[in-house]
């Protein structure tokens, strides 16, 4: 099949969840199909990034949003009732160019990643799949709860996003999302017809061969410019570390990931805490920690950081919200804790019981290998596209 894959950001480098998902879906689909990448971008794309995608794509086309027009397109979209999350990515001049380009390709199918990009392709006369991936309206609702000063604004944006998520549904033939938990969060009557297709993990790449002795007791990895990850890093240092100190446990903590702002970077001042920021090979950060701690209580989707840690035989302590999307068995594959006391006790258990530590490290990797293989997940997407049928709930 000739497939056009449309993204709201260029899929490489894969430092964000949507880019990771797009990259691997394109990579695997390209083995049996002709892929044409259409990427919307607010910035210029490096030659290195372009070259990374070309082995998998018949054509790669980047449409650059005109930055100087952003205030006007955001205002125009707002007056039309569009969510900011959509109008920020929707340049109407580029829209015509994108549509002309795709029509010229004459695809058998169009995959559109995220509602951000849906406005570019919703009217095209081809069969189309929309990947909701996460539920943006729920994410905005969470921000409204957390930010009292801007609550009214975030609530309005959440309502607009929910309305757009419902409206855009009818313009696509198939629909997918990253987890059943996210599907349940959608406020629409037809959500049971949305297929759940999780991300995967390259378990050969994400493997810890035990050649490196960890320097830190606890590690957290993530895009540190993302709100829920910032909150998690701060929670670890300001809530967990002091509680562990009360128990006479002086732990060393590593916080690693791209775009640490002032708030996260300031955590470096706490004794025993290292904020490394961007790491060229993030596997080194995972290998440098004994326990992966991710007490996340907000956010959306499937947390790939947990899957990567489990794949590297790193026992994980996380929240029930995060594990709901993963589906691991608490106490066997992963430790689930939702209070400071329970999280601290989970950490102590793993620090004090080497046998339990090893059992969970191995069980976690086995679970990820069995349930989160990229090939298996993309095959589900391929089957949905080839059969050209709407997903029917089991």
What are these regions (language model features)?
Residues 1-62:
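N-terminal subdomain of nucleotide-sugar transferases
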Residues 8, 67, 71-88, 128-167, ...:
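Acceptor-binding helix/loop patch of EC 2.4 sugar-transfer enzymes
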Residues 129, 137, 154-208:
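Donor nucleotide-sugar binding/catalytic pocket of nucleotide-sugar-dependent glycosyltransferases
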Residues 173, 287-301, 312-315:
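Acidic donor-binding loop of glycosyltransferase active sites
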Residues 196-288:
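Conserved catalytic-core segment of nucleotide-activated headgroup transferases in glycan assembly
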Residues 305-308, 315-319, 335:
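Short hydrophobic beta-strand element within catalytic cores of glycosyltransferases
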Residues 334-341, 349-354:
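Conserved acidic donor-binding segment of nucleotide-sugar-dependent glycosyltransferases
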Residues 349, 356-370, 377-383:
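A short, well-ordered alpha-helix in the C-terminal region of glycosyltransferases
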């Amino acid at each position: 099949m000739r497939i056009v894959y449309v993204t709201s950001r260029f899929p490489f480098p894969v430092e964000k969840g949507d880019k990771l998902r797009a990259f691997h879906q394109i990579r695997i689909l390209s083995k049996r199909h002709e892929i044409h990448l259409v990427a919307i971008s607010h910035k210029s794309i490096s030659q290195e990034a372009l070259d990374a995608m070309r082995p998998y794509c018949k054509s790669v086309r980047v449409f650059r949003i005109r930055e100087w027009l952003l205030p006007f397109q955001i205002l125009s979209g707002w007056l039309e009732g569009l969510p900011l999350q959509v109008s920020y990515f929707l340049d109407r001049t580029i829209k015509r160019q994108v549509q002309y380009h795709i029509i010229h390709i004459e695809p058998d199918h169009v995959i559109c990643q995220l509602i951000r990009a849906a406005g570019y392709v919703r009217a095209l006369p081809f069969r189309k799949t929309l990947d909701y991936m996460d539920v943006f309206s729920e994410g905005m609702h969470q921000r409204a709860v957390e930010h009292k000063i801007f609550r009214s604004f975030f609530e309005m944006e959440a309502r607009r996003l929910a309305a757009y998520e419902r409206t855009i549904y009818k313009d696509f033939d198939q629909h997918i999302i990253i987890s059943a938990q996210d599907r349940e969060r959608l406020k629409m009557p037809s959500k049971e017809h949305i297929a759940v297709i999780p991300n995967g993990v390259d378990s050969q790449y994400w493997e810890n061969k035990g050649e490196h002795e960890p320097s830190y007791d606890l590690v957290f990895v993530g895009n540190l410019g993302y709100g829920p990850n910032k909150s998690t890093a701060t929670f670890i240092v300001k809530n967990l570390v002091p509680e562990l100190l009360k128990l006479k446990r002086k732990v060393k903590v590593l916080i690693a990931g791209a775009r640490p702002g002032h708030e996260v970077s300031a955590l470096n001042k706490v004794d025993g805490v290292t904020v490394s920021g961007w790491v060229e090979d993030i596997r080194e950060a995972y290998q440098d920690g004994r326990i992966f701690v991710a007490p996340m209580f907000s956010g959306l989707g499937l947390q790939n950081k947990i899957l990567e840690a489990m794949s590297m035989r790193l026992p994980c302590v996380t929240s029930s919200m995060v594990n709901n999307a993963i589906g691991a068995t608490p106490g066997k594959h992963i430790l689930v804790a939702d209070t400071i006391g329970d999280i601290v006790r989970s950490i102590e258990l793993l620090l004090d019981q080497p046998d339990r530590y090893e059992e969970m490290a191995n069980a976690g990797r086995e679970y990820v290998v069995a349930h989160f293989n990229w090939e298996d997940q993309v095959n589900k997407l391929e089957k949905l596209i080839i059969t050209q049928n709407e997903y029917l709930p089991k």
